[in-house]
Amino acid sequence: MTMLSTKTLVYGLGESGLSAARALAERGYAVTAADAADSENARASAAALGEFGVQARLGAGPEVLEGVDRVVVSPGVPPGAPVLRAAEERGVPVLSEVALGLELLGSEVRVAAVTGTNGKTTVADMARRILEEAGLGHVVAGNSWTAITGKLEEIRSAGRLVLEVSSFQLHYMRDPGFEAAALLNVRPDHMNWHASFEDYAADKQRIFGGQSENDLALLGARDPVCAEAAEGLSARAVLVGEGGTRVEDGCLYLEGERLVRVEDLGFAGRHNHENALFAAALARSLGASAEEIRRGLEGYRMKPHRMEVVAERGGVLYVDDSKATNPAAVAAALAGLQRPVVLLLGGSEKHTDFSEVADYLGGCRAVVCYGEAGGRISDFLDSWSESRAEILRASGLEAAVREAEARARDGDVVLLSPGCASFDEFSGYEERGEEFARLCRAGLAEVQRGAAGA
């Protein structure tokens, strides 16, 4: 059987599923598509695929596997979905859209890949900035970026790919053999998708599959899962945060070479400085020099909703860290602040453990717990006897901002670092962050109007 005659089912008609089906159809592969839903969005996706000659079945069950040789699955489809369980029982291979994209690219492109519970989008973005500064052709794709199958010709032309991959995408990937691969950290997250933390950690470590001794593996030195994983790798392993690749005496060092002073960077926080080291190592693997890395990092500015100052009034800073959707990210944010904090925690429930956040409550004046998960979080923090922070409850984000404003004092930081997903109120962390900024700026406008009328 030739690859062109291999019949592929693309299951899940989100952005990556649409991209995968189009890429296969445009290249003459036999492809069908399906989705468990029969919603307005699914029907729109099916209509779009019809223009490429791809038939799509909606409200589909395991019957769509009839005559199928393999399945390409969208990241939003959990492993326990009936179609995927049936595929496993029948021995039908399942792969992610990213794995399909790498297959279609072949070996002609140099790939530097990054994953981790927190920081992977930032690292990919920093690497992008460095490669731009170096004038090296590249494409950034995967997870938070454009689907890889939608950029195949552009990637081939550039010759270099910075690839951000999630645990969902890695779950259905076998031995990708990346020239450089980074695992930043592994903390409990997405436990509603993975069977256990051990399974989640194992999926993250798939990023190192298929590497040889000539390849580079980067791992977070301060993360216990990463430190243990480093011991059994085939590639050359570098622990970021200790040894030659570290932050020390106000400088960033990459494998013993001083790169840049922290004071010359446009972003703060130890976790972000270590993110910069990961990005520097990935960019160097793709051909960037030390001087190009320095200039790239000095010119880098953080993406929105990542410790972004959105307002300041009465000596209080209002900081949007809406991208912090798990407790480990909240802990990292609190560890990087030197001022008293009024913290906003909450959102949609993922049943994660907030013990790591509780360890940092000594720097908090108050914690406002809100949304669907707010009750559980506030009950847990109330029981944490070592904390002197005032624990408050609010119904939603707007009420939480008002509570925070009432308690913040000159010199404080009001920090939205929710530690939860946003879907109880918003479409995603971006909309949540934008609403937080709007509320904070609206409060500033009210103060200014009051001052003008005084």
Residue ranges and their predicted role:
Residues 16, 123, 373:
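Hydrophobic/small residue at the entry helix of a nucleotide-binding pocket
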Residues 1-96, 100, 268, 449:
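N-terminal leader/targeting and accessory segments in enzymes
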Residues 25, 64, 75-221, 225-236, ...:
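Phosphate-binding loop of NTP-binding sites
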Residues 32-35, 58-60, 95-100, 234-249, ...:
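Beta-strand->loop->alpha-helix junctions that form or flank phosphate-binding loops
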Residues 30-37, 217-221, 344-345, 364-373:
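Short internal beta-strands
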Residues 2-7, 19-27, 108, 260-366, ...:
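Nucleotide phosphate-binding/pyrophosphate-handling subdomain across enzymes
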Residues 45-54, 355-412, 453-454:
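C-terminal helical cap/extension that packs against the catalytic core
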